[in-house]
Design a protein with these regions (language model features):
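N-terminal beta1-alpha1-beta2 submodule of the flavodoxin-like/Rossmannoid cofactor-binding fold
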Residues: 1-83, 88-104, 148, 160-178
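Short, glycine-/small-residue-rich phosphate/pyrophosphate-handling segment
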Residues: 92-93, 105-149
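A short acidic, helix-capping loop that chelates divalent metal ions and anchors anionic groups
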Residues: 119, 155-161
Length: 178
């Protein structure tokens, strides 16, 4: 059994990326894994100010929801990120959280397998490329981990447009395969 954390970064209710995250989580649970889905919707996540206090003390100077999320990520075997693509890039919330996770850098971590779920109005295959590159930059800082899978579902604009889309089953199967 693996400990799986699924981080849904969209702030929109009924978002397509959140629905993919839910299916991934369901698949991972169906395989007997311990799964927790974290939605950034309603979370307080302040911007990193680059003070690097976290590198000296191991903790960020801000008191918000990030330390709790970070602790869960550090202790997970699998981390799945779900993000809508905005202007061909990951959501601002996802990037802000990644920046704030700088405090994790000197710490030991369990995660090895990273997954990325992306959705966008644009349907071209290379639409999420920059988001994947951005996440890979974070992954590269954790030498024992790697990107194990990326699922992109394009052509979904409005909330819940993804309902009935084959991508939902693909997310479920990807989760089941962790």
């Amino acid at each position: 059994m693996k400990k799986v954390i699924v981080i849904s970064t969209s702030l929109r209710a009924g978002s397509n990326s959140d629905m993919l995250a839910e299916k991934f989580a369901e698949g991972a649970k169906a395989s007997g894994n311990e799964v927790e889905k974290i939605s950034l919707r309603g979370k307080e996540i302040k911007f990193c100010v680059g003070c690097l206090s976290c590198q000296k003390t191991g903790a960020c100077v801000f008191n918000d929801d990030v330390p709790e999320i970070m602790e869960k990520v550090l202790n997970a075997d699998v981390v799945c990120w779900a993000t809508p693509i905005y202007y061909y890039e990951m959501s601002g919330q996802m990037k802000t959280l990644i920046d704030r996770m700088n405090a994790m850098y000197p710490k030991d971590y369990r995660f090895r397998d990273i997954y990325l779920l992306t959705t966008a109005a644009e349907a071209e295959e290379d639409t999420p490329r920059r988001a994947e590159i951005g996440l890979t930059g974070w992954i590269d800082c954790y030498g024992k981990s790697s990107l194990k899978g990326h699922l992109f579902c394009g052509g979904v604009t409005d909330a819940r447009d993804i309902e009935g889309n084959a991508c939902l089953m693909q997310a479920y199967e990807m989760g089941k395969g962790v």
